[in-house]
Structure formats: structure tokens, C-alpha cells
Regions:
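Metal-cofactor-dependent catalytic cores
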Residues: 1-149
């Protein structure tokens, strides 16, 4: 899935495809920066351009904790399948000819825990996903393949 929240605190909306801008983020997302400069605490920061999480992590969390959260509830932009995202820290990868760089792990935070209303720490530490930098402009769609470079 592909998810975007238009403003801080707003619910995320699912999309079939999104436009990405190098150094700026996902068009329409709360962290998108028109200028590429830091207009707030996060906009324009390479590790806030796009976030990813593994569907397998969400499924495992739901199963182990007895929950049925939807993948969008985790507030990551992309939900992937079949690839270990932790292995992409410090590495380049592509999705539909768009180049990305894995900046750091996207650890779960207290605000996500409050939003979900259940304990997610320490269960999701080291499993919360990946923060990545968008290296070139392009469009990605649901079902596009993530390929490590």
C-alpha cells in the first residue's frame, strides 16, 4: 500500500500511485517541502522524505498481540512485502526506476503508540521500518517492485 497524510495529525489516505520529488518528498504528504529547505522541524530533511514498513512486521505484530490493525494505522508511506528493510540502511534501492537511499531505521514513537492505543514498545523496536531519501523525481504505484542496487 501507499499512504499519505496531508497534514500533521491528519488521517492517512491510501493511493494507487504518488509523485515523488527528489530532496522534497511525496507530493501531498505532510513532510513534503516545496523548496527542499527545512521549513519546519522535518520538512526538507532527507530522512523524512519517505518511510517504509514491511507487511510481514505488521502481520506478525497483529498476530502476536491479538490485534487487527490495518497497515495504514502504522503511518508509514509504503508497505512492502518480501524484502528486509533493515538491510537497506546505508544502501541504494529502486522502485519503478525511482532511486532511493536508506538513511536510517524508522523506529516506532510514543505518538504512534498513543494513536494506536496499545503498547508497541519494545515489540516494534528495530522493526518499525525505514526512512529513505528520494534521489530522483518519479512516480511509484501499488505493486511496483523494490529492488536493492
Amino acid at each position: 500500500g501507499i499512504y499519505v497524510a496531508p497534514a500533521k495529525g491528519a488521517g492517512v489516505m491510501g493511493h494507487q500511485k504518488v509523485s515523488l520529488r527528489a530532496g522534497k518528498g511525496i507530493e501531498g504528504d505532510r513532510y513534503f517541502s516545496q523548496t527542499g529547505k527545512n521549513r519546519s522541524n522535518y520538512q526538507g530533511q532527507p530522512d523524512w522524505e519517505i518511510t517504509l514498513i514491511e507487511s510481514e512486521v505488521i502481520e506478525s505484530f497483529n498476530q502476536q498481540q491479538g490485534h487487527s490493525f490495518h497497515e495504514s494505522d502504522f503511518r508509514r508511506n509504503l508497505v512492502t512485502q518480501g524484502i528486509g528493510l533493515n538491510d537497506l540502511v546505508g544502501k541504494c534501492f529502486t522502485i519503478n526506476n525511482v532511486s532511493f537511499y536508506g538513511v536510517q531505521l524508522c523506529e516506532p514513537c510514543a505518538s504512534l503508540q498513543r494513536r494506536l492505543g496499545v503498547r508497541i514498545l519494545p515489540e516494534l523496536v528495530g522493526k518499525g521500518g525505514l526512512r529513505a531519501q528520494i534521489r530522483c523525481n518519479g512516480v511509484i504505484a501499488v505493486g511496483d517492485k523494490l529492488t536493492p542496487v
